[in-house]
Amino acid sequence: MAYRPGWVDHLIGWHVYPLGFVGAPARLESQEVSHRLAHLGAWLDHAVALGCSSLALGPVFSSASHGYDTLDYFTIDPRLGDDDDFDHLLQAAHARGLSVLLDGVFNHVSRRNRIVQDAQSAGPDSDAGRMVRSCAGRLDVFEGHSDLVALNHDNPAVREHVTRIMNYWCGRGVDGWRLDAAYSVNPEFWAAVLPSVREKYPDVWIFGEVIHGDYASIVRASGMDSVTQYELWKGIWSSIESRNFFELDHALGRHNEFSDAFTPMTFVGNHDVTRIASRVGQDGAVLATAILATIGGIPLIYYGDELAYRGVKEERFGADDDIRPVFPASPADLSNLGADTLRAHQSLLGLRRRHPWLVDARTESLDLTNERYVYRTGVPGVEPLIVELDVRDGCSVLIREAGQVVWSSGA
């Protein structure tokens, strides 16, 4: 079983894309600092009231545009603020019992990054040139994005650079990392980097973005603690949308297998996908959250999903804006449109917090048709929860413990 520090047993994350949340300009046009992180700080109490114990941040390092085109790993993006702003947010989160996770974009950098500029100036056969990947004099890029230049992960100097970055921010007080596009990096790279980080910070939690593949083998080979459970994400929304719980049952069977090897990172929304409420409606989104709250793993709630925000992922410039929205200045400025969904999230996450063993839960199907699914979720030695999902006439959820209803979507 992959490593899991004790504090992660209770981790429920509020996943935020900072540049969108605070309404930062789309591109970094100057180095003038705008102190926008205070905007996010005003929402920390909301995260706590929601039932979360962690703030999972998208990119905060200086970048050319969307945060995944890093310019400087040791500098806070001026559109968000400066070191003092970040330290204040970190301290405020910790004071509320919220751990803080950062997004480490170590597969690629901006074409404007000093690493790339030095490589181009010095040539591919130089020490600087070997920091990035190239072929026949052309820089390798990430998934066809010409502005995203791939780092050369076979180079020990790149391993040392990434290790230094991770240790630096852990030293600043960060509790964990999401490794962006971890699926594009040879697991041997992570296996070389992560032990040096854990040697100094043994309680750090590190999970990778992995979409396809043998999750358990990737975790084992890389030394990462966990990976994102995209198979389950697909199984949840697709089974509700198509009214086919056989797909969810299959996904939960796979989830049980993965959970024998590591503790998966679970979610129904993130900064890269169409909003769950846009896929399955508001009631369907609550049903999806009920699944998330009652299965094994470490759940992440994407900001706005708890308020029934909608947004569709598109393939064009600026296509992510709809799913990475600006939030109001404070919770007091919210409308009442998402109030019912918020209350449902709070009560479901409260249920999960009262049953901390759910992090290790396994599910078992009790009754299965296309439109109705009943499963048992539990661990040895505890009273299990019985979860009933029904999409025959709308979407409804009933959760029982020892024969008593402990949560109902109609309550």
PLM regions with names:
Residues 106, 178, 308:
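Short active-site segment of divalent metal-dependent hydrolases/proteases
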Residues 12-15, 55-57, 100-102, 177, ...:
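Hydrophobic faces of well-ordered beta-strands that scaffold small-molecule active sites
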Residues 51, 172-173, 201, 295-296, ...:
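A structural signal for short coil/turn segments at secondary-structure junctions
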Residues 19, 60, 105-107, 182-184, ...:
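Active-site beta-loop-alpha junctions enriched in small/polar residues
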Residues 4-9, 28-32, 249-250, 258-410:
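Loop/helix patches that line or flank the sugar-binding groove of alpha-linked glycan CAZymes
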Residues 101, 176-182, 275-277:
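Short catalytic-loop micro-motif centered on adjacent basic/acidic residues
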Residues 91-96, 164-165, 180-260, 264, ...:
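Active-site-proximal helices and loops of the catalytic beta/alpha 8
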